[in-house]
From Swiss-Prot:
PROSITE patterns: PAL_HISTIDASE (PS00488). It comes from Bartonella quintana (strain Toulouse) (Rochalimaea quintana). The gene is hutH. The lineage of its organism: Bacteria, Pseudomonadati, Pseudomonadota, Alphaproteobacteria, Hyphomicrobiales. CDD domains: PAL-HAL (cd00332). GO terms for biological process: L-histidine catabolic process to glutamate and formamide; L-histidine catabolic process to glutamate and formate. NCBIfam families: hutH, PRK09367.1. PANTHER family: HISTIDINE AMMONIA-LYASE (PTHR10362). This is Histidine ammonia-lyase. It is an enzyme of class 4 (lyase). Its main location: cytoplasm. It comes from the Bacteria. There is a cross-link at A142-G144 (5-imidazolinone (Ala-Gly)).
């Protein structure tokens, strides 16, 4: 299925489908007129004698140098080749696809001045699976994501490297195998392509989409744990959350209540609730903590969908034909959003790890055996799995330090304040990988704890989740080589397989 993009109106759901499902995207035909109009205006300026930044001048600190009209194409090519300075491992294909899509959206507004042929090449690369090799490091998130975007454009001009049919090859070879032709850049086109926040925004969106899946997995794991330790659900009563008023807290409490509603374990200790209202905070305060995390993700989503629809290169062509230099390439909004997402990921993992610790400690687990082990002592059960979760939680705490506060001057002090959005967003991927494992460990431990409550059963919804879990991972009856179990649990959480057996009861990630 091809997703047709209407710049300025692209939705979070469309971008999520591109990220998770690899959907191909293209611009709506209605964008073509504005694109042509912008390109004509740039061609008009390039043919004149007036120096205009980015069209017939040097770049950055060299902006005062006028470039001869005959050298404009060379200028644009040199710009791309000289800026291909990113280093590190290649970004994942789904992130590069998302990045290319975001660049299409930006160009589709008609304010960048590129030719329609260039847009069509980018669309064709997406459609035919020519995926530029883009090293992950090298952007400071101001004056755009220059280095990573330059690697994308390098393939468009027959340089650089690309993946085609999962094989890494030269950019020229990839285009040839896809029956596409490299393009010669004209005035401003190179700058329009590499000036922009699309790499940072793609990474932040990936962190957001993964983080939302982790949050839902954390809510599910938290419900399982609540039943495993015979926790009180009185703190999930909707009215107390309505009295506070935070949207995330309200919808999270509703979700937890639905997940546990018809549990036999829950019914068996209802009469004891008067004595159990003081459960540890990791059980009792789930709506407050996870609700706040959800609200943070929603706020970040609001910023990122605006940025996804934005024009962020420089200079820009206004509707009256005026060309104005500004600073839309500065990715501070993206950097702040990435930092906010990092805080939420850190807290989702923190409260999950505390619930794991609760279940393995027989002094507070309401009758569960030490470390959830049968014949404890001979068997260690979840002893070291809990330590693994603690290690990953601590790692995420360190990565949650805000990246946006760490500006440094660059480019001979011309670009003297930068956002650090790119690595601030990229670290979300590592945090989510840790988080999927933490939640996976909690899910395994909670399922084991619930099985100790037999013959009492958990809720019908949680039974369906446990049934899906046990298709992949057996109950831990005696100690065994656990690493494969943790890996499988990680995959189940990351891919949303456990969530897929449930009805749509989780709050939607939609900007309010």
């Amino acid at each position: 299925m091809t997703i047709v993009l209407n710049p300025g109106k692209v939705t979070l759901n469309q971008l999520e489908a591109i990220y998770w499902n690899g959907e191909v995207s293209k611009l709506h035909n209605d964008t073509h007129l504005a694109i042509r109009k912008g390109a004509d205006r740039i061609a008009e300026i390039a043919a004149g004698s007036q120096p205009v930044y980015g069209i017939n001048t040097g770049f950055g600190k060299l902006a005062s140098i006028k470039i001869d009209a005959n050298d404009v194409a060379v200028l644009q090519r040199n710009l791309i080749l000289s800026h291909c300075c990113a280093v590190g491992a290649p970004l994942a294909e789904n992130i590069v696809r998302l990045m290319m899509t975001l660049k299409l959206i930006s160009l589709g507004r008609g304010a960048s001045g590129v030719r329609l042929e260039l847009v069509h090449l980018l669309e064709s690369m997406l459609a035919k699976g020519v995926i530029p090799v883009i090293p992950e490091k090298g952007s400071v998130g101001a004056s755009g994501d220059l280095a990573p975007l330059a690697h994308m454009v390098a393939v468009m001009i027959g340089e650089g490297e690309a993946f085609f049919q999962n094989i890494r090859m030269s950019g020229a070879a990839a285009l040839e195998k896809a029956r596409l032709f490299p393009i010669t850049l004209e005035a401003k086109e190179g700058l329009a392509l590499i000036n922009g926040t699309q790499t940072s925004t793609a990474l932040a969106l990936a962190g957001l989409f993964q983080g939302y899946r982790a949050l839902c997995g954390g809510l599910l794991a938290g419900a399982l744990t609540t039943d495993a330790v015979m926790g009180s659900t009185a703190p999930f009563h909707p009215d107390i959350h309505i009295l506070r008023g935070h949207y995330g807290q309200i919808v999270v409490s509703q979700t937890l209540e639905k997940l546990i509603k018809d549990s036999e374990i829950r019914a068996a200790h209802l009469c004891d609730d008067d004595h159990r209202v003081q459960d540890p905070y990791c059980i009792r305060c789930q709506p407050q903590v996870m609700g706040a995390c959800f609200d943070v993700l929603v706020a970040a989503a609001k910023t990122l969908i605006i940025e996804a629809n934005a024009v962020t290169d420089n200079p820009l062509i206004l509707s009256n034909g005026e060309v104005v230099s500004g600073g839309n390439f500065h990715a501070e909004p993206v950097a702040f959003s990435a930092d906010q997402i990092a805080l939420a990921l850190c807290e989702i993992g923190s409260i999950s790890q505390r619930r794991i610790a609760l279940m393995v400690d027989p002094t507070v687990s309401c009758g569960l055996p030490p470390f959830l082990a049968q014949n404890a002592g001979l068997n260690s059960g979840f002893m070291i799995a809990e330590i693994t979760a603690a290690a990953l939680m601590s790692e995420n705490k360190q990565m949650a330090h805000p990246a946006s506060v760490d500006s440094t001057p660059t480019s001979a002090n011309q670009e003297d304040h930068v956002s650090m959005a790119c690595h601030g967003a990229r670290r979300l991927l590592a945090m989510n990988e840790n988080l999927f494992t933490i939640i996976g460990i909690e899910t395994l431990a909670a399922a084991q704890g619930i099985e100790y409550r037999a013959p009492l059963k958990t809720s019908s919804l949680l039974q369906s989740v446990m049934k899906r879990l046990r298709k992949n991972i057996d109950t831990l009856k005696v100690d065994r080589y656990l690493a494969p179990d943790l890996h499988k649990a990680h995959i189940l959480v990351r891919e949303g397989h456990l969530l897929s057996v449930l009805p749509e009861i989780f709050p939607r990630l939609e900007p309010q």
